[in-house]
Each structure stands twice: as C-alpha cells, then as structure tokens.
C-alpha cells in the first residue's frame, strides 16, 4: 500500500467558526477546550510506518480548529522532528490567529523553528462576504485575509488557500 500523507489530529472537535457543513459543529466550552492526552508511543509507531512508506508530508489537522490548542501543536512538532519529514503542514481556518496575533506570535515563531513549513487556510470563497457568512455569521466582517497572509509570510511560512467547495460560493 502506498501512502501519500501522514495526518495527525490535533485538539478536539471544538471550533469558533460556524460552518453549516461541519462534521462536528461543536462550539468551545469548558470540557472540549481541555487538551486530551496524546499517545506518544502510537505516534512514534505511525511516524516510523510513514517513513518506511516514503511519506514526505505531515498534515496537522483537526475535527475542530487546531489553533485553539497551540501548546499541543508545539508538542506534536517537537515529537515529529525525529522523523525528518521535509514538509509539515497545518490545516486551519486561522481565525484565532487573525483575531489575536499577539497571543500567537511566539507560537508561530516556535512552530517555524520546529519544522512547520506550510499553513493551509480553509476558505469557501474568494469573496470576504461569503467567507464571513459561512465562518463568522455573528460577526460584522470576515478576517482580513490579505493581512493574515502577509503576517504569516513574515515568519517564513509557505501558504495555501484550501477551498471547501460549496455550491454558489466560488466565482466561475
């Protein structure tokens, strides 16, 4: 069997976005904002299997929003270093980062130093008003995506916009 990517689930199902298509759709609360214990032994087994399978990319993702658990992202990156994956990506809506740059600045520096190469930002459209309607319906506007991209580039990250395909959301 040939694998292409090693996916690592960070955090819980908790998310601050309000996507109508979300599989978990769980808002942050006292219970789901508690970091779960990670089985580092099993991560090592999976990392070794990924190496033997020729995988070159790790995707840190979540059932919710991974950046709600920045300490856990840091811990995963530290444990993944021993496997020398050339590409380590984080899939996120990046809303927490955009709304609180001061909180995340130290983490972003650390993540880059620990080997995070790419951040994939989830969007549903190239139009801010459509992204706002899906991700942040209770806010007046969507995050400033252009500013966020410049900010993340300033740390050295490669970026990719990952478009969640929804009917009538993206221009032709």
Predicted features and spans:
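Conserved glycine-rich "GG(E/T)P / GGGxP" loop and the immediately following alpha-helix
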Residues: 31-89, 93-172
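Canonical Radical SAM [4Fe-4S] cluster-binding loop centered on the CxxxCxxC motif
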Residues: 1-41
